Amino acid sequence: MLKGSSSTSFLLPQQFVEPLPHAPVEISALHYGLLSRNDVHRLSVLPCRRVVGDVKEYGVNDARLGVCDRLSICETCGLNSIECVGHPGHIDLEAPVFHLGFFTTVLRICRTICKRCSHVLLDDTEIDYYKRRLSSSSLEPLQRTMLIKTIQTDAYKTRVCLKCGGLNGVVRRVRPMRLVHEKYHVEPRRGEGPRENPGGFFDAELRTACAYNKVVGECREFVHDFLDPVRVRQLFLAVPPGEVILLGLAPGVSPTDLLMTTLLVPPVPVRPRGCAGTTTVRDDDLTAQYNDILVSTDTMQDGSLDATRYTETWEMLQMRAARLLDSSLPGFPPNVRTSDLKSYAQRLKSKHGRFRCNLSGKRVDYSGRSVISPDPNLDVDELAVPLHVARVLTYPQRVFKANHELMRRLVRNGPHVHPGATTVYLAQEGSKKSLKNERDRHRLAARLAVGDIVERHVMNGDLVLFNRQPSLHRVSMMAHRARVLPFRTFRFNECCCAPYNADFDGDEMNVHFVQTEKARAEALQLMSTARNIISAKNGEPIIACTQDFLAAAYLVTSRDVFFDRGEFSQMVSHWLGPVTQFRLPIPAILKPVELWTGKQLFELIVRPSPEVDVLLSFEAPTKFYTRKGKHDCAEEGYVAFLDSCFISGRLDKKLLGGGAKDGLFARLHTIAGGGYTARVMSRIAQFTSRYLTNYGFSLGLGDVAPTPELNKQKAAVLARSVEVCDGLIKSAKTGRMIPLPGLTVKQSLEARLNTELSKVRDECGTAAVQTLSIHNNTPLIMVQSGSKGSALNIAQMMACVGQQTVSGKRILDAFQDRSLPHFHRFEEAPAARGFVANSFYSGLSPTEFFFHTMAGREGLVDTAVKTAETGYIYRRLMKAMENLSVRYDGTVRNTKGDVIQLRFGEDGLDPQLMEGNSGTPLNLEQEWLSVRAAYARWVVGLLAGSKTASDGNAIRDNENYFNEFISMLPTEGPSFVEACLNGDQEALKVCEEQESREDALHNSNGKTNDRESRPRTGRLRRAVLISHLVKVCSRKFKDDIQDFFVKKVREQQRIRNLLNLPNTSRERTEGGGDNSGPIANKRTKKRAPSLKVKDSKEGGRVSELRDLEMLQTELLPLTRGMVTRFIAQCASKYLRKACEPGTPCGAIAAQSVGEPSTQMTLRTFHFAGVASMSITQGVPRLVEVINANRNIATPVVTAPVLLMEGEENHCEIFRKRARFVKAQIERVLLREVVSEIVEVCSDTEFYLRVHLNMSVITKLHLPINAITVRQRILAAAGHTMSPLRMLNEDCIEVFSLDTLAVYPHFQDARWVHFSLRRILGLLPDVVVGGIGGINRAMISSNGTEVLAEGAELRAVMNLWGVDSTRVVCNHVAVVERVLGIEAARRVIVDEIQNILKAYSLSIDVRHVYLLADLMTQRGVVLGITRYGIQKMNFNVLTMASFERTTDHLYNAAATQRVDRDLSVSDSIIVGKPVPLGTTSFDLLLDGSISNDILPPQRCVKRGMGPNFHTAKRHHLVPLAAEGVFRLDLF
């Protein structure tokens, strides 16, 4: 039973909601309980009994229980089927039966209480103690469950009741629904021996039976007490009320409610009758089962039944009552189950049950679905809605004065003419009118008044939600602006394909038309495409240019691409909007003809006119950057923008595509916002698609035809490779091949052949690419621009397809020791094991084609298998993390208020706003370029503001100008930065004084109103910003800034050394420097006459040293003004990157981890640096980590070699020590180091002589000799379960360091031979070296680490030569047991990141931190499984909507669970807004000032006003508190 406490809430789907006297209620808590017999009778409208024929009165289809057809009327309330929800009835059972859902609870209670007096089987002290614990208000449901289990365990151990002395045995479940009490089966384990019990019912019967048959008394322990429902009910009635709480029930609840004595019959509308054919009508399954129960009850009421038939009928009633609850009947024999019946359990659980199909996921109105197609002419945030869909979907538009005439025109158009309307709601009449009749339209249009509501069509500019399933992350549903166009498909810009994971091969998508102004506002501000350009997963652009857009941009921005005035103007017109202002830039070439470059075209796209305040400055390398110079790179691989001027480079996918944090859109989004970035993206899409159409871009066979030179190179490479492979195969067959570490000869051969054959394809591919021209070869253009394909595809098309692999191995000999019948047995040649020497151009041979299909099939199978697994991973993560959100105090909590993190991601920053590639808040290098450009503009503006040249020279010669605008010395810079970051008051004072001087100097030239002037009124000054930075920024961020300036100072020192400038203040004061540097000499020779200091009337000119200082400042301006501007800008941006309160960080983190899992495979990968060690990766490894498995497939311990001081660069010492560590770690069996074991038999003694192979031991650097072997054998014999436990110290004797003897435990000649044979069979498998749990250890390629296969972390850490502070293990459970919960959390984070890194997938580490903190929040590692989620103390409906639906509901009802803080799943199920995002605060109207803005009645009516503030739910915050919002009406 669900009992709901309610509070008033306005949830009606209108734009403006007025307070109603009978407003709908909002469920604020859920109370689960048991319906007693009296409760059922109170809810029921009539008792049901068996009826025969067509009689319905008092049957389960009685009309008083409701009706399900439109023509009938309910006899209870008099309403029809639409308005009447029905009324329940009841069935009184003739005899009680066990409740299937509470049967386990009944069993536990029977074990807890005395079967004679019904007291709990504990003493009074324990009862009082547990009562106090259970009565505590702070006891969580999970803790309460564990405490009840402890009570039951203690009571179960009691044999004799401490109250009545009754004997209590074991209560067992026999058959599906029967209990027996094995009273005499077990001897007493707690309490006194049995006392006489003359009053016991079962004892009296036993004494009577023993009097008639003495054998019964002798077999007393096999006599069982049958506990039928009547007997159990009697025991439950006798339970003292004060001890009910110890049984797990709430005070005042009777345990008898766990038994079924009365059944509640649901209303008829719940179980409507259906058609079984064309004419036949059949009852619902529930109705049929209730009728069966009535038949059994009616039969039992017949007094003529004997005991046997009565018992059989009773059991049938029990079975039918159980089948009513669950037709699968767990525990029942198969012939009794009726799985085709849909009982209560079947209607609730599984994917198609009520919880997941109807409550958690609901069907919606105002939606449409159609096929999608591309349209690059649409803006990025636009969606082409078919005209047919636009006429069907409507919006309730309220009529007001501004749109009165428009609404009248729409009403006159009607439902069939677009734009039109379908219905009108007349507010004065309170009725809705249809517009199908043309005569009514004109009449209603004339009567249309302000306040009426018109259901109008979708119109251009309306916000619609667009969604593609499966919706794996937030941006699978975004808001677009509708544009109504003809035809039948939804069309949108291809830039939006990535977030939807959509292609245009027949995909269908859904559109939803939002119905309220609140929904429109939320969709615009939270879900619009422009606001989701950056992914919340890792801060990378997810909406970006793709395919043809990239190829065209690559071509246009290439070197030597020019357009004349007509062509350039035509190109501009392709993207120019109707209201876009633009100004053509100055041509790049003026004579003999004006020509503009493609780069200038992109400059104009980014900044159409100087009036646009978007000054983009950044630098970034492209994919093919050669690192041989930046702006003069031969491949144009370095892109640079300065103040929105395209300086150098060629745009490709790394600059324009998704996932590029250093790209154009990421930087543009940072400085101009998402709206402007979307406009620029739309311009690029519209221009490039048109340009490529005119340019002509096609792919044919001629583009991939190999040249004769390429064929010659390919033949030479193949011949050389075949020769090398033949040599390897021959050396393996002759036994001359040295196996790789940890591998057999065959495995080593496979590894070497794979390596060699991979080189063939790579070399052929390199040669193929070199034969192509970037100017006219379309495949190469696509590869270079990143629009499609890779160099590997070109290699396979032109040169060689290469080696085909299945599960990372060559094609196996699966057909009679060969891969195909075409080859010889055991053939290892490349062609026989899957190597494809042909290209797609030349065509594949039959065997090559077969091998190629085998490799392709693996991908298909892998995709099909992983889909279900990754979907389940995603669902579990979402269910576990959906309740987590950022609160107003900065903590991350669930809906119950439990703290998961003190700061989200440890620093409280939003991952979506992170600009650095490693998750850092800012890209400091790009910020430096931006600040440097702005600073240069300001200085240039300052100098240019002088009226005459003499004024400019005066400014330059001014000492203050020199001190303020010349770079600090390398010795001054770091200390000044550190002082600013540490909040040093002297440094801040210097900043303030410097700003004052800059203002004075700037204002003196009349530049106070310039856009680049000093900060305007209301903006924080730099000193204030820097002081605020010290308080709120993380220590790591400040360290990053300081490290950045350290690099800049080193760069400054290199420049000053080239110029031979002083590096200290003393040298500068003394005029140091002999002007002998290479650059200084050139400048001196060139400008010597003009650099000498002269005395003149104008005050003289600057000295040569000062001129060089200015040159160094131009190259790297490390001035105080530049540094303080940079720190202030970083500070202000850092403050804006905080994660906003209410952010559903849990759901975003779950999506960020779950969505990339769909791109993984199910394979294993080689460990980094060790090719011979394969570890589990991909989806299987992710499952192991998030499930917190106790046993994983490939545990690995990484042991770094201990470094001594001064040994950092000695590789040979590294390797020697690594070999020594490996010898200590790797398990060594006696058979591996023994040369022989000889059985010695003489007249006096019998023993085994063991000879060690010291040459092998020395070669492998093993610390093993006869003494250590003796110790290991004795240690193995010391275990209780060891087969060598008969050996002791006297049985082993050491003869020498390489010889020892093992004697049998006894020297009896009759048995000694068998004893020696037994020891001889066991002795070779004794571990004599290394760690027993580690089968193999490998040294990494760099020799600094030893990797051990196993989970013996503690043993590895205790070894000499191992740096125990850096030992790492990938087994979470082992790390938790050895190092604690914090170390386990760190391993979870590292393992998930490594899993994603193996597939080149990246997510922000803050999401992984949140997942790890959730798994470890209770001090133990809890897996994201059905059992782990249950231990995380989730609400009942949350767990029921996940798995084991009925079990959770039964347990909640039995324990009287109360859920007061509704979670996300709970809120969705009960129809309440989820407590996240915009629902995490209240908007409250300040009534004291609302009268000045709007009339009082309008303010109340609209529910909004001019001034609002936030408040936590049910807690008001004064207006003066922090977090005040202002909502401006317009």
UniProtKB/Swiss-Prot annotation:
Entry's Gene Ontology molecular function annotations: DNA binding; DNA-directed RNA polymerase activity; metal ion binding
An annotated GO cellular component: plastid
Cysteines joined through disulfide linkages: none
GO BP field: DNA-templated transcription
Chain ranges passing through the membrane: none
Keywords, in A-Z order: DNA-directed RNA polymerase, Magnesium, Metal-binding, Nucleotidyltransferase, Nucleus, Transcription, Transferase, Zinc
Native source species: Trypanosoma brucei brucei
Record-given protein name: DNA-directed RNA polymerase III subunit RPC1
Start and end residues of each stretch annotated as Disordered: 992-1016, 1057-1099
Annotated compartments: Nucleus
